[in-house]
Amino acid sequence: MTRYIFFSGKGGVGKTTMASATAIHYAMEGKKTLIVTTDPASNLADVFEQKIGHKITPVKGVDNLHAMEIEPDAATREYKERIIGPYREVMPEDVIASLEENLSGPCTTEMASFDRFIDFMEGDEDDVIVFDTAPTGHTIRLLELPVDWSKHIEESAKGTGQTCLGPVQTIQDSKDKYDRATALLKDHERTTFIFVMRPEELSLYETLRASRELKTIGIDSGEIVINGILPQDVCEIDFFRRKYESQQKVINEAQTAIKKPARHMFLRDNEVKGIDALKDVACDLFSGKKAASITKSEPRAHPDFVTDTPEVQKMWLPERGSKALFFTGKGGVGKTTISCIASVYASQRGFKTLLVTTDPAAHIGEVLDVKVGSEPVRVTDNLHAVMVDQEAAFRQYKEKVLNDAVGKYSDDMVAAMEEELNSPCTEEMAAFNKFIQFIEGRDYDVVVFDTAPTGHTLRLLDLPFDYAKQVEMMVSGDEMKEEAQNRFREIINILRDRERTVFNLVLYPESTPILESYRAMLDLKEAGIETQLVIANMILPQEVCANDFFGNRRRMQMKHLEEIKDRFNLPVMGFPLLEEEPRGLDALRKSLSSIRS
């Protein structure tokens, strides 16, 4: 056991459950244990069934265990005060105002959450600290930050002494802190990385990709947990027997490719919620249990779930002009597959369609079976696909800004701008700029956005509002200021226009994705954005639920489908669990029957 244990993996693979069960295990062994989540759309409180929030909170029912959810807004306030506080009594008001202006950028939120995360690594109050991280692409970004920011502070100290987080002298201590964090993350004696994956091709692909990326910054994974394995003895009919065989193939591939110790966790016949269920998972996780438990019950019939298909068609297809379709939700609910199906649907109806992914761990290329890059690639005559590549967007953005500046400003000013642009937070600005170009564009009738998991999508959608507020202080010149403000206002208007933009929440019928999607709907509403459709994915077909195990899971789903209708009060489209992951246009076209039936 190392002191620091990180859980990472593709969205929806069960990271929070495995991290929580691990924390419970060590707490029950008598070790003072803390579990911290760095996911902005945390499910920790949902899993433990108690309020946690942005403070270290005792977990009810487990001695020695505390938990905390790092809330970005609260972390930002704390971070700003930590930087500015010591100067309030000794510096003039204009200097304080300048510091506050520097710390008002959207990138400060990312930095603040990261800074709070490092605080836990430097504390000495706990024997074990378990980190439940955001889905893989965002976790990689988090773990790269100590290196990126340390380099940026060092380079800025040689130049103007300014960073986007303020003068170097005010954050020099942070550089030392980030250097220490980097050393800790690379220390195998003190830190363990555990990848959680499902026995599915896309999950394996994501795990291998993330493992390679971590190695480039000197971090090696310690082991893997393969979660959600179908028990062989319940796969009696062909539908599940074929799924079982497919899973076993992926499990063998994973153990050959990753060459790390692997723990196998079986799918349960009900969802994991509450301390008792987590203790059972902890027992299985650390005992190496090789059998699944099944609750015996009397089979009861449930009606199939009916959706309003014509209304869905009207929502997704433009009557005039262009339309943007956003698909968001918890990781692992099938956003990418549904986005690809929607794109194929619109393109086959004669609309020129662009599929855009904003997820750093994007895999639309694997689903479409084409190579997707930072420029739109042709899939069919009416369908193109593109990935918002943060590094490519950063290079393009930096080049454009500097080219525009040459001739308008002095060489010293251009050099200072280049130094500022080398900040890691410029990558976020560049990716956002690319994102809004696709919203503004007029080249396509339908633009489908396959977004990152919920918390990061809400962050992306907040950016037009954040940057609009900052234009006053960030842009010089009345003409430039008015142009920038008008651009952000137009983006906000497009996002709020129900005729031009449709927000679709994707979930599967279990408590955690329902609660996360509901919170996302409320957050969007607060920003003036109305959700128009809920897509309930992975519904078990009644005809394949021929035993207690799958009968129990279907009854659970039907109960939650009724809850979805009541809670959201929106049209609901149901998608069945597919026998295999769709790959390529033929498989996606076959899946269109879920819309047409």
Say what each PLM segment does.
Residues P135-G137, P199, G332, P453-T454, ...:
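Short glycine-rich anion-binding loops that position phosphate/pyrophosphate groups of nucleotides
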